[in-house]
Amino acid sequence: MNAVTDLKHDYLVADIKLADWGRKEIAIAETEMPGLMAIRDEFAASQPLKGARIAGSLHMTIQTAVLIETLKALGADVRWASCNIFSTQDHAAAAIAATGTPVFAFKGESLQEYWDFTHRIFEWADGGTPNMILDDGGDATLLLHLGAKAEKDVSVLAHPGSEEETFLFAAIKEKLAKDATFYSRNLDAIKGVTEETTTGVHRLYQMAQRGELRFPAINVNDSVTKSKFDNLYGCRESLVDGIKRATDVMIAGKVAIVAGYGDVGKGSAQALRALSAQVWVTEIDPICALQAAMEGYRVVTMDYAAEHGDIFVTCTGNYHVITHDHMAKMKDQAIVCNIGHFDNEIDIASVEKYQWEEIKPQVDHVIFPDGKKIIILAKGRLVNLGCATGHPSYVMSSSFANQTIAQIELWTEAVKGSNKYPVGVYTLPKHLDEKVARLQLKKLNAQLTELTDQQAAYIGVSKEGPYKADHYRY
């Protein structure tokens, strides 16, 4: 165990003495998070999350600290772990732990520690269970569902398909040996989950299609004020921040390969082009490929790009987008990184047999048998959080305002005993999306034009909104 913990307290962080530093940065972040702070002010008196016990699995950053304190200000009880072994900002974790909120996170966790910490968010000090999940990537949701399956048939854990699954399955077996009904007991208590990111949402839809999902879920990722802002504008700033901090390379003139041209890929490509890289895009989807081509990017295959690129960024949410053979073809000193949620976009396992030389934390040379070296950042995990500090506070305010509203929506309906959200996956209604945008605009001194009665009638909308149909593509 690398982290320092006080066993008298219900937390595990790197160094609790970092709390004062974290508190100062949290105060700055609050000034850059208008949407989230406005929601805190609006609902503090009514306490809509009173009674909610939220198990949170999301990057433990300064911005997440503001989210946690907003949830608490609205009445929730919270336990927290990071959803990535490299993404924790240790001073942020310390600042939250110092307030009495249980936090289990430090930068550079092992996979064994990661799954231990994810279990800890379900282990309430009073022996009870959480009743809500706030998830990023779906690991907390997966843990309960898979664990409950294993209670009935442990053979579901017999064949791990990756290093990650090896540690996950071992953690579940260890827990079952101590508490045979841990997962089903927690699963039965959960009223709903709000999911932050594309990868986690994909998991939720798959579970729902298979009839395995056990509670309602709100897909926060597909709120316009999340996906079109966090995914695009957030990545546009944080990708290059991570690459620069890790390598100090000049980006201008280099050939940068962006794998995937969704919202994350669009932001990543814009960032690299803004620094005068020659940006090439790989895509499977002809619509996204056409968008990239119309923006002036060269659209190629990874097989072709591998030997030409200087910088490679995966943004797909898919599996083995960069393979061993691709890396074997790359130039000496090519930089390889990922800004999708999981580390399997790059086939890291296939190059673990070679010599690795750590340059500094989260920056490694992989040395091939012929002596060629490539630079892998954050061991294939999120480069913007592994090698930098993630997205700026302002854009995370939009995402976390949506998360808070979604938690309120699911919890208040559960308390009322309504049937508004039977088991399934939902998105927030348009008027709440627009509300988040209005709250964010105030910080930018933007002035909205107001429709006249005639104009509203002409286009068939209310003067107060929503202004677009659900099928509108922003």
Swiss-Prot record:
UniProt-listed InterPro entries: Adenosylhomocyst_ase-like_sf (IPR042172), Adenosylhomocysteinase-like (IPR000043), Ado_hCys_hydrolase_NAD-bd (IPR015878), NAD(P)-bd_dom_sf (IPR036291), S-Ado-L-homoCys_hydrolase_CS (IPR020082)
Pathway: Amino-acid biosynthesis; L-homocysteine biosynthesis; L-homocysteine from S-adenosyl-L-homocysteine: step 1/1
UniProt superkingdom: Bacteria
Catalytic function, reaction form: S-adenosyl-L-homocysteine + H2O = L-homocysteine + adenosine
Gene Ontology CC terms, in alphabetical order: cytosol
A GO biological-process term: L-homocysteine biosynthetic process
SUPFAM superfamilies per record: Formate/glycerate dehydrogenase catalytic domain-like, NAD(P)-binding Rossmann-fold domains
Subcellular location: Cytoplasm
Catalytic EC class: hydrolase
Cofactor annotation remark: Binds 1 NAD(+) per subunit.
Residues that bind substrate: 61, 136, 196, 226, 230
Keyword NAD: yes
Xref: PROSITE patterns: ADOHCYASE_1, ADOHCYASE_2
Residues that coordinate or bind NAD(+): 197-199, 231, 260-265, 283, 318, 339-341, 384
Gene Ontology MF terms: adenosylhomocysteinase activity
EC number(s) stated in the UniProt entry for this protein: 3.13.2.1
Xref: SMART domains: AdoHcyase, AdoHcyase_NAD
Cofactor(s) listed: NAD(+)
One Pfam family it belongs to: AdoHcyase
UniProt keyword terms in alphabetical order: Cytoplasm, Hydrolase, NAD, One-carbon metabolism
Function: May play a key role in the regulation of the intracellular concentration of adenosylhomocysteine.
Family (UniProt): Belongs to the adenosylhomocysteinase family.
Protein name: Adenosylhomocysteinase
Species the sequence originates in: Ralstonia pickettii (strain 12J)
Organism ancestry: Bacteria, Pseudomonadati, Pseudomonadota, Betaproteobacteria, Burkholderiales
Gene name linked to the record: ahcY
